[in-house]
Amino acid sequence: MKLVVRLFSMRAVVMQGPQLVVGTVPDPRPGPGQLLVKTLVCGICGSDLHMLKSARQIYEASKETQEPLRTDPSKDIVMGHEFCAEILDYGSGTRRSLAVGSRVCSMPFAIRGNGVIAAVGYSNDFPGGYGEQMVLEESLLVEVPNGLDTDRAALTEPMAVGAHAVEKAQLGGDEVPVVIGCGPVGLAVIASLRLRGVGPIIAADYSPTRRGLAEQMGADVI
C-alpha cells in the first residue's frame, strides 16, 4: 500500500520580487461562503507580466484610485486569475449547489473576514491559479458546461472582460466599432461585437499574427 503524506503545503509558482520561483506555500483554507478548488488550467495574463516587472510601481499608483491594491509586493504572491478549476471541498455556510469534482470558473475575487475584497492572484493571502489549490467565493462561481474542454474554459475571464467592454459601450447598432490592439481581450471584444451583429468591425494591431486572428474572430477591416 502506498502512503501519501501531505504536509499542509502546496506547490506553486511564487512571485518573489522580480522573479518567479517554484516552491511551496501553505494550503489555502476556505472560510464561510467559500470553497477549495484544485487548479486544472491557468493562463498567463498580460497583467501578470506587468506585475512581475513593475509590482512596486503598480502598488504605488493604485493608491491614487478608489480601489487600491491591498497587497505587499515585497512578500510572496501566487498569481493567476484566468483559470479553470475543480471543486475539492466547501467551507461553512455554503449552499453546496455543485458537486465535489465539478469544473468551475470564477470571478477572481475573495472576501476577507473583515469584509474587504481581495483579488485572487494579486494578494498575499489568496493565491491564484499558479498554485495547486485556490479558495474561491461560492457566489462568484460559474459551472463549466459539459462539452467545453478545460483549456477553453480557462478563457472565460478574458472573454468576460471583452464582453463587459462591449456591454458598457451601449452600442445602438449603427456604429462602426474600432478595436485597437488584438491581444486576447481585443479578440474577445471582436467576438462579442460579432455575436451582437454589430459591424463592420475595424481592427488594428502591429502584429501580423494578431491581425490574422482578428480576421478569424470576425473583424471586417484589418
Regions from the PLM with identified roles:
Residues 6-13:
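Short structural boundary motif marking the start of a folded domain
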Residues 12, 22-24, 36, 84-86, ...:
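Conserved hydrophobic/aromatic beta-strand scaffold that supports enzyme active sites
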Residues 19-23, 46-47, 113:
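Short N-terminal binding/cap micro-motifs at the start of the first secondary-structure element
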Residues 28-42, 57-110, 145-147:
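Glycine-rich beta-strand-centered segment in the early N-terminal region that forms part
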Residues 69-76, 81, 106-180:
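NAD(P)H dinucleotide-binding glycine-rich loop of Rossmann-like/cofactor-binding domains
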Residues 148-222:
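Mid-domain Rossmann-like dinucleotide-binding core that forms the NAD(H)/NADP(H) cofactor-binding site
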